[in-house]
Amino acid sequence: MDGFYDQQVPFMVPGKSRSEECRGRPVIDRKRKFLDTDLAHDSEELFQDLSQLQEAWLAEAQVPDDEQFVPDFQSDNLVLHAPPPTKIKRELHSPSSELSSCSHEQALGANYGEKCLYNYCAYDRKPPSGFKPLTPPTTPLSPTHQNPLFPPPQATLPTSGHAPAAGPVQGVGPAPAPHSLPEPGPQQQTFAVPRPPHQPLQMPKMMPENQYPSEQRFQRQLSEPCHPFPPQPGVPGDNRPSYHRQMSEPIVPAAPPPPQGFKQEYHDPLYEHGVPGMPGPPAHGFQSPMGIKQEPRDYCVDSEVPNCQSSYMRGGYFSSSHEGFSYEKDPRLYFDDTCVVPERLEGKVKQEPTMYREGPPYQRRGSLQLWQFLVTLLDDPANAHFIAWTGRGMEFKLIEPEEVARRWGIQKNRPAMNYDKLSRSLRYYYEKGIMQKVAGERYVYKFVCDPDALFSMAFPDNQRPFLKAESECHLSEEDTLPLTHFEDSPAYLLDMDRCSSLPYAEGFAY
């Protein structure tokens, strides 16, 4: 028994009295409280320093709110090429923001299959599970396009005192993340900061719709078209302008293409009002240039150019067909204004209607000129009793000059024509080098140009000009006067008034 008792030595725990336990417990509590307080104090100081640094950086990063400073989103590496304020605002975040985002998900029950710690930098733009990114990751997307089910939270904007709940995480301090820092409005309106796509649905309820005035500014910033998902009805902010394909130009509405009728209305006043004295085309539509060329008639020139019509208006500009004898244009322009000045000296009131135009296509080149009329008369042997060739080259003689003048008046529809007026017109051919007066002989003239050229110009396309017959106004014998007695007297004009009552196709008064 002694050995047995010697073998068993009981292990005795030295007992402590109740007073010793009371003395030792406050020491342990003080140590534990000191450690907790020290940890919280250190964490608060650390986060406070980061918050102050963040405030200093945000204060330095303020830029003037104008349209000149817009970040360029077309670069492939946005972080390397973006302006420094944008880079600082997008990347530098304290761990407390990550922890607070974690606490948001844990507290509000978000289960999106994403990692708890979400990095807010521009590198990590993860789409929500179940959605494919619409554009390559080099193009920053609008939050409304990245995740239309979850509108962007109130990130960079104060939300009337509602701070994110910290959840079970203790000792976070004043939550120095930039989401809760109240910054001036113009700065937040300058940048489009990518938001995390896995924000809970409950957050946008306390966010007014007018907190997104900066979305309009970046409507024309992205470099690739983004086709949004169908907007969810009832979600705040779904009526904001969507992001479109744009470069960095300011927002201006694209000018609509000019309507097709704009050019036609532009051309109409030119032809209706631009040329006085010419009849304009009908006002119902635009006329083609060929229609404009065919509008001017002979009476435009007959109104002031009585004897020989100028080919300046008709020769090269208003002709609609050019077949045959292509070099006729220049000589016709050479003879254009030969008969203008003498007839302007007439002071009488012209009451005769214009000449009725009919005949072969020769008339398409304009009215008959005096030298053509003389060549046509000389070419017809039936007219040899009042005009004939003398046989000396290109000389011809006006045997009855008043008869020639009368026929010329019939041709030009001028009954008052006489030889004096005809001779004044012939004097201009002297200056033009077409004909000359033969010295020493009365009523004898000669053409000085080449005979072949003369006849080819007088008879284009080998067609004789159409000469009008005797006057359609049938006068009685007592009304007819000798040619030498024709005057520009009012009595003669009153006698000829009966001729003006005859119907003409173009009865334009002078």
Swiss-Prot record:
DNA-binding region: 368-448
Residues with the Phosphoserine modification: S248
Cellular localization per UniProt: Nucleus
Position of the Glycyl lysine isopeptide (Lys-Gly) (interchain with G-Cter in SUMO2) cross-link: K350
Family matches, as SMART domains: ETS (SM00413)
Residue ranges, annotated region (Disordered): 131-208
Ranges in a coiled coil: none
Keyword field: DNA-binding, Isopeptide bond, Nucleus, Phosphoprotein, Ubl conjugation
Tissues of expression: Ubiquitous.
Molecular-function GO terms, alphabetical: DNA binding; DNA-binding transcription activator activity, RNA polymerase II-specific; DNA-binding transcription factor activity; DNA-binding transcription factor activity, RNA polymerase II-specific; RNA polymerase II transcription regulatory region sequence-specific DNA binding; sequence-specific double-stranded DNA binding; transcription cis-regulatory region binding
Signal peptide limits: none
Compositional bias per record (Low complexity), positions renumbered to this chain: 161-174
Primary location group: nucleus
The keyword Ribosomal protein is annotated on this UniProt entry: no
A Gene Ontology term for the protein's cellular component: plasma membrane
Any GO BP annotation: regulation of transcription by RNA polymerase II
Description of how the protein assembles with itself and partners: Interacts (via C-terminal) with ZMYM5 (via N-terminal 120 amino acid region).
Name of the molecule in the record: ETS translocation variant 5
Organism field: Homo sapiens (Human)
